[in-house]
């Protein structure tokens, strides 16, 4: 008799995705981040669900409800910090996953790549709205500053901002709707993840060499289930280390002060994982220009597949492109640092140089380097 996992309508889907899936035999640890992101999403949904049971989305009680979770709810502090730091882990995995995609040319799977970009935007929107919910100083002012950016849109900007706010400033209506969106978006993200995987399984995984691996496949289980399990263990260990030893390491002390519309914090800045984009936004003195640069900093990923001029898919055997890639990584770290600094000399200039370099590497230098490498290899 045929195994039930191969015949049952539901188990068959799981079998084709996680058990009998033919996978390349040489995929490295860089291919672990997809499954790690799945784990992060699950942790966020579960901890978020338990937090939502005790949280109140009202300006008068939001801050104290978070305090109540940490002080009075059984293991509430653990759930809250797992959720907050889980978001940081989520973004670390996200950026590594995207970086892997750029390095190994995975972006040539256009549908998978584009769904991935939509996923990135959705996760960023979710994280931003989640940061507003504790209703601390940075929550309030972060929401005010970021939503205000939409007022740069010509003609409809101001109306749009007031429509999002549900009034003339960030207030009760804003907090309530942000909570509603923050709750629903992870489920939309889960649906998008399924589409992402659906498109990936149409083509199969890429591999470090960038060469088709149809002649050399191994079953996903037990090889990659074991490898993923090790990844889960390491990531969860790192998350627990962060949560149990230094839960506020990545947070902002200002968010322990209740939101006060009459007092502006000295430095308004988002969570660390948005600082690179924030630095790009601030590096342009014009409001609309800054907003466009901010959006383009992520949207530029959609252009990358069309700028692939190399005869090879992966960067494994392309030293010039490799050097540019790691300069890009260093540049993003520089932008992250600048985003957290005050707007003064020399940080303004460093931010502007780093922003120009960011777009130059992706849009100009990498395609040029690929052409040079083709010439070197006489292709």
UniProtKB/Swiss-Prot annotation:
Instruction: Provide the organism lineage as a comma list.
Output: Eukaryota, Metazoa, Chordata, Craniata, Vertebrata
Family classification: Belongs to the cytochrome b family.
Spell out the note in the miscellaneous section.
Answer: Heme 1 (or BL or b562) is low-potential and absorbs at about 562 nm, and heme 2 (or BH or b566) is high-potential and absorbs at about 566 nm.
Q: Which InterPro entries match?
A: Cyt_b/b6_C, Cyt_b/b6_C_sf, Cyt_b/b6_N, Cytb/b6-like_sf, Cytochrome_b, Cytochrome_b_C_euk/bac, Cytochrome_b_N_euk/bac, Di-haem_cyt_TM
What is the cofactor note?
Binds 2 heme b groups non-covalently.
Put simply, this protein is called Cytochrome b
What's the protein's topology in the membrane? Answer: Multi-pass membrane protein
Task: Output the CDD domains linked to this UniProt entry.
Answer: cytochrome_b_C, Cytochrome_b_N
- Quaternary form? The cytochrome bc1 complex contains 11 subunits: 3 respiratory subunits (MT-CYB, CYC1 and UQCRFS1), 2 core proteins (UQCRC1 and UQCRC2) and 6 low-molecular weight proteins (UQCRH/QCR6, UQCRB/QCR7, UQCRQ/QCR8, UQCR10/QCR9, UQCR11/QCR10 and a cleavage product of UQCRFS1). This cytochrome bc1 complex then forms a dimer.
Q: Which residues bind heme b b562?
A: 83, 182
Q: Its gene? A: MT-CYB
The record lists the membrane-crossing segments as 33-53, 77-98, 113-133, 178-198, 226-246, 288-308, 320-340, 347-367
Which Gene3D superfamilies does this chain map to?
A: Cytochrome Bc1 Complex, Chain C (1.20.810.10)
* GO MF, any single term: ubiquinol-cytochrome-c reductase activity
What does it do?
A: Component of the ubiquinol-cytochrome c reductase complex (complex III or cytochrome b-c1 complex) that is part of the mitochondrial respiratory chain. The b-c1 complex mediates electron transfer from ubiquinol to cytochrome c. Contributes to the generation of a proton gradient across the mitochondrial membrane that is then used for ATP synthesis.
GO cellular component term, pick one? mitochondrial inner membrane
Name the domain of life.
Eukaryota
Cofactor(s) it depends on? heme b
Location within or outside the cell: Mitochondrion inner membrane
Indicate which residues the UniProt annotation says bind heme b b566: 97, 196
Give GO terms for biological process: mitochondrial electron transport, ubiquinol to cytochrome c
Q: Which UniProt keywords apply?
A: Electron transport, Heme, Iron, Membrane, Metal-binding, Mitochondrion, Mitochondrion inner membrane, Respiratory chain, Transmembrane, Transmembrane helix, Transport, Ubiquinone
So where does a ubiquinone get bound?
201
Pfam families xrefs: Cytochrom_B_C, Cytochrome_B
């Amino acid at each position: 008799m045929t195994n039930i996992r191969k015949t049952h309508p539901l188990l068959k889907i799981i079998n084709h995705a996680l058990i009998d899936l033919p996978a390349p035999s040489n995929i490295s640890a860089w291919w672990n981040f997809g499954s790690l992101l799945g784990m992060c999403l699950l942790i966020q949904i579960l901890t978020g669900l338990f937090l939502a049971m005790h949280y109140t989305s009202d300006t008068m009680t939001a801050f104290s409800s978070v305090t109540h979770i940490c002080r009075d709810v059984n293991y509430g502090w653990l759930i809250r910090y797992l959720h907050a730091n889980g978001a940081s882990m989520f973004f670390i995995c996200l950026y590594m996953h995207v970086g892997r995609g750029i390095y190994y040319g995975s972006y040539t799977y256009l549908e998978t790549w584009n769904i991935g970009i939509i996923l990135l935007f959705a996760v960023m929107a979710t994280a931003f709205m989640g940061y507003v919910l504790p209703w601390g100083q940075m929550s309030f002012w972060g929401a005010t500053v970021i939503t205000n950016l939409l007022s740069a849109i010509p003609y409809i900007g101001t109306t749009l901002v007031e429509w999002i706010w549900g009034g003339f400033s960030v207030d009760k209506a804003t907090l309530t709707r942000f909570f509603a969106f923050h709750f629903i978006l992870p489920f939309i993200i889960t649906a998008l993840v399924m589409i992402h995987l659906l498109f990936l399984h149409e083509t199969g995984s890429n591999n470090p060499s960038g060469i088709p691996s149809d002649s050399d496949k191994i079953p996903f289980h037990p090889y990659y289930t074991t490898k993923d399990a090790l990844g889960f263990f390491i990531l969860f260990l790192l998350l627990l280390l962060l949560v149990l030893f230094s839960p506020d390491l990545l947070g902002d002390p200002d968010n322990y002060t209740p939101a006060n519309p009459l007092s502006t914090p000295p430095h308004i800045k988002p969570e660390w994982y948005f600082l690179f984009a924030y630095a790009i936004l601030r590096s342009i003195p014009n409001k609309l220009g800054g907003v466009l640069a901010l959006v383009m900093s992520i949207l530029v990923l959609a252009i990358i597949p069309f700028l692939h001029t190399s005869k090879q898919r992966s960067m494994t055997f392309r030293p010039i492109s490799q050097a540019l890639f790691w300069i890009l990584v260093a540049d993003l770290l520089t932008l992250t640092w600048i985003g957290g600094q005050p707007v003064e000399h020399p940080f303004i200039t460093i931010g502007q140089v780093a922003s120009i370099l960011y777009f130059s590497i992706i849009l100009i230098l990498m395609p040029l380097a690929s052409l040079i490498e083709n010439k070197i290899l006489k292709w």
